[in-house]
Amino acid sequence: MNEPKIRFVQKKDLLQLVNLCKLHADYEKADYDVQQKEELLNKHLFSDHPSLYCLVVEKEGRLIGYTAYMKQFSTWDATNYIYMDCLFMTEESRGFGIGEKIMDKIKEEAQKLGCA
């Protein structure tokens, strides 16, 4: 079996990402309307100044997890920080330490974005 790969989401992944979001909502017992999600995610993830960043976990050509985060500014600390909106792994991919690897990758990306 191939090791899962953590990478930035690509436009070609948007349908799979929306499907993962639906699974995430089901897990949280929340409503999730898939209408226009691909279009809206495309707008916010792939603009010249993205308002959202997303890492996905790919295994054997299929997305098995994702995390979404944003660069924010703290008035109190007068510095930038990363706000992680969510982290979700499919049920069969949990328990293998992938979440910890995702957190390490977010820390790396936070430094690149000039966040504490």
Predicted feature residues:
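A short beta-loop-alpha structural element at the N-terminal edge
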Residues: K5-N19
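A short, internal acetyl-CoA/4′-phosphopantetheine-binding micro-motif in the GNAT/acyltransferase core
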Residues: L87-R94
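A short helix-loop-beta-strand connector motif used in the catalytic cores of GNAT acetyltransferases and
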Residues: L45-L55
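Conserved beta-strand in the GNAT
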Residues: V56, R62-K71, F88
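Conserved acetyl-CoA-binding loop-helix of GNAT-fold acetyltransferases
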Residues: G95-E108
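Conserved GNAT-fold acetyl-CoA-binding loop/helix
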Residues: C21-K43
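Short acidic/polar active-site loop segments enriched in Thr and Asp
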Residues: A116
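Conserved donor-binding loop and adjoining core beta-sheet/short helix segment
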Residues: T67-N80, D85
